[in-house]
Amino acid sequence: MLSNLLKSIFGSRNDRLIKQYLKIVRTINELEAAISPLSDEELRAKTSEFKQRVANGEKLDQLLPEAFAVVREAGKRVLGMRHFDVQLIGGMVLHEGKIAEMRTGEGKTLMATLPTYLNALSGKGVHIVTVNDYLAKRDAEWMGQIYRFLGLTVGVVLSQMPHEEKQAAYAADITYGTNNEYGFDYLRDNMVGHSAERVQRVLNFAIVDEVDSILIDEARTPLIISGMAEGDTEIYKRIDTLIPGLTRQEDEKSPGDYSVDEKTQQVLLSEEGFEHAEKLLSEAGLLSAGSSLYDPMNVSLIHHLNAALRARALYNRDQHYVVQNGEVIIVDEFTGRLMPGRRWSEGLHQAVEAKENVPIQKENQTLASITFQNYFRMYEKLAGMTGTADTEAFEFQQIYGLETVVIPTHRPMTREDRMDQVFRTPQEKYQAIIADIKDCYERKQPVLVGTTSIENNELLAALLTKEKLPHQVLNAKQHAREADIIAQAGQPKMVTIATNMAGRGTDIVLGGNPEQEINRIRADETLDEAAKSKKIEEIHQAWQARHDEVIKLGGLHIIGTERHESRRIDNQLRGRAGRQGDPGSSRFYLSLEDPLLRIFSSDRVANIMTRLKMPEGEAIEHPWVTRAIENAQRKVEARNFDIRKQLLEYDDVANDQRKVIYQQRNELLDAEQGVSETISAIRESVVHQLIDRYIPEQSIEEQWDIPGLEKALASEFHLQIPLQKWLEEDSELHEENLHDRIIELVDTSYLNKVEQVGAPIMHQYERMIMLHSIDTHWREHLAALDHLRQGIHLRGYAQQNPKQEYKREAFELFTSMLDAIKADVTKILMTVQIRSEQQVESVAETSALRNLEYHHDTHSELAEEQPPVAENRENKQQPFVRKNEKVGRNDPCPCGSGKKYKQCHGKLN
């Protein structure tokens, strides 16, 4: 109450920020009179002037009014589009590293040109992040006209792009690309064998379009690069045939072998289920007589059994995936698009393939991984824009340190958002939806119907066909026609049924979009200019008539067939109507059997319906119901936030270790004088550790195991050292000088090898072996971390803190990995016999990674929503190195041990 009173007196923080920005807007508007008379050359010359001023030490903030005025003028000349004052405000918000919430149709794409141009003047590069390749390419071509006119270079990063083109795109002043591609390029840059193969520069400034989709919806799904693992795929088919023999528990009291938890997307075997499963596995010859599923050697069987149960109980065809050309293709739950080449991990995809009786592909091994949360936090400055961020403002602030600023609309919003109608059954709900669509169709009002799955999408399409109502269907199966369908969704009498993919990034223009028709006329070589102008004018007049007609009818009508888990996604659907002050309306139709209500709120709403004595077939439309639904959504949003926060806390451990490994790797790649000094330090450390194993510190000679040490030196380093003879001949030989003599002999042996082979060849080989060893052990370490994380929650039963235990054990694993790398490198270099340079090149070829797959995967114990996916691409890995976060020798080690870097993981240097 007090906060509301203070707001009414002083205004909210958002209001105060807008007032501050408006002062700068006035300055920009005053500059327009001086900028407008400039010639094109003079306007372009402003870029060189600004760059020089930045080089001389002037801050970007000081340049902002002039730079924005120049971009506004360029927009007028090149695109015929002048930035509104609200777009100038949005540009300032983005430049300050905040999130700009701007309503649909208010011009976010044009707004982004302002801070992009300003920050590109520093010469460090700006990354514009979009949700798909189509938008990246479209915006680079469209808005790129402004940047090129002003003398800046523009690049676009696409998924199948050749290596050289990708390097050129990242070298440009401004780069467009998708969130996935930026992340995968970063990982690939840290897997290359030569520094020249990297593609990314320093991560300077990123503007994330649809920031809620990328930083919230996809935050639970890490980017993973993997390769094929060995293994027999036949087991998936054999296990799948056993699943129908297990019965599902309908509730806690009823008998059954397994239960399904829809909230956490998990399948749990009961004790009876374990016994029944063991019997079925024994009969199938998969479990040896007398052994149990609990035996260590049968852990993989539990893994396969769980994957098969999840595939049968939780994953449905045409909802979570489709089957095309003998392949299981995942459907993106956020966009409704098909994701060819992507795969669920942990054997789930193979289990679904077995269920659908299509060819089964092998499982994958993780080679590199990072979450969007940790990738985007590496940028020196991060900003975002979307139409719906305010509901997630707390999370943006907590996780990314990003403040959300709501930008005022250019024109007042006139869309009418009607109250939800709730029915008892889906049948009643769909009858009401059909009646609403029919009413709009008869009045010629365009309708966009939003569905949450392909299954519901096609069900509604079938009902409309039965009613003989013409309509367009937009889902993952028709994604090729997406632009055409969305472009015409605002036509009179047009009925469009769409999944979540409903054209984010594409405006629905009332009366239809005439641009396609106009472009066709312009490309027609049989018409002269006069004829083209006449036809284009006729098209404009026809569009204006349709536009006016649709406005009179009330604009675009939005129908939601069920509520999403997040209020934000509902708002995105509503936001398709009412752009730039246009009229429009929206309504959601729900039933008590919809997933959100069934899982979270059905009892409460059913009680309300009973209390109000609602007859069957009647809808309830009441503030109580709306409140109950919003509470259910808040519950889900809070749960999802906790999951994302928990994922980040666990991933931060791996992230600190990742930084150390990638820094070591990049120092190896960039070392101009070779890595001989590093190799020498590692060799000395390994030899000391080996000697300490047989001659413990502060021990007496009787405790020494000299024969064991002689044998170890022979097997590890191929060195025959007569230690026993030394001791017999020299009574003065003690522990310390024995260490020194052994190390001296090891060094001499190695230097002799370098002389025989030649220093240049040996230095090249040293670098390759170091990189190969780091990469191999890092992959194994990632698998170990994943295995550790899967079972760490069980520590809670032993009164231990799982997160603390995870940090402690992950650190121990990391230390062991570093020791293993050192031992591995030393042993190989001491024992290898190099006869030619071709041998070295063959090692490089063997080390090159091929047939990589690119995943978007959830960690198993956190997989409470859409799980694991992977994308298969055939292009060579290519890639970035972040140098500006280099750890100083006396700084605390990033691994969290509390030691100085030079005394911990810096020893590798």
From Swiss-Prot:
Amino acids binding Zn(2+): C893, C895, C904, H905
Cofactor binding: number and manner: May bind 1 zinc ion per subunit.
Residues that coordinate or bind ATP: Q87, G105, E106, G107, K108, T109, D507
Organism superkingdom: Bacteria
Record PROSITE patterns: SECA, SECA_MOTOR_DEAD
Gene Ontology cellular component terms for the protein in this record: cell envelope Sec protein transport complex; cytosol; plasma membrane
Record field: compositional bias (Basic and acidic residues): 871-889
Subcellular location: Cell inner membrane; Cytoplasm
EC number: 7.4.2.8
Alphabetized InterPro entries for the sequence: Helicase_ATP-bd (IPR014001), Helicase_C-like (IPR001650), P-loop_NTPase (IPR027417), SEC_C_motif (IPR004027), SecA (IPR000185), SecA_CS (IPR020937), SecA_DEAD (IPR011115), SecA_motor_DEAD (IPR014018)
Cofactor dependency: Zn(2+)
Keyword Nucleotide-binding attached: yes
Catalytic reactions on record: ATP + H2O + cellular proteinSide 1 = ADP + phosphate + cellular proteinSide 2
Gene3D superfamilies: Helical scaffold and wing domains of SecA, P-loop containing nucleotide triphosphate hydrolases, SecA, preprotein cross-linking domain
This protein's UniProt keywords: ATP-binding, Cell inner membrane, Cell membrane, Cytoplasm, Membrane, Metal-binding, Nucleotide-binding, Protein transport, Translocase, Translocation, Transport, Zinc
Annotated stretches, region: Disordered: 857-909
UniProt GO MF annotations: ATP binding; metal ion binding; protein-exporting ATPase activity
Mode of membrane association: Peripheral membrane protein
Keyword Zinc: yes
Listed GO biological process terms: intracellular protein transmembrane transport; protein import; protein targeting; protein transport by the Sec complex
Task performed by this protein: Part of the Sec protein translocase complex. Interacts with the SecYEG preprotein conducting channel. Has a central role in coupling the hydrolysis of ATP to the transfer of proteins into and across the cell membrane, serving both as a receptor for the preprotein-SecB complex and as an ATP-driven molecular motor driving the stepwise translocation of polypeptide chains across the membrane.
Record's subunit section: Monomer and homodimer. Part of the essential Sec protein translocation apparatus which comprises SecA, SecYEG and auxiliary proteins SecDF-YajC and YidC.
Family per record: Belongs to the SecA family.
HAMAP family: SecA
Official protein name in the record: Protein translocase subunit SecA
Organism the protein comes from: Nitrosomonas europaea (strain ATCC 19718 / CIP 103999 / KCTC 2705 / NBRC 14298)
Name of encoding gene: secA
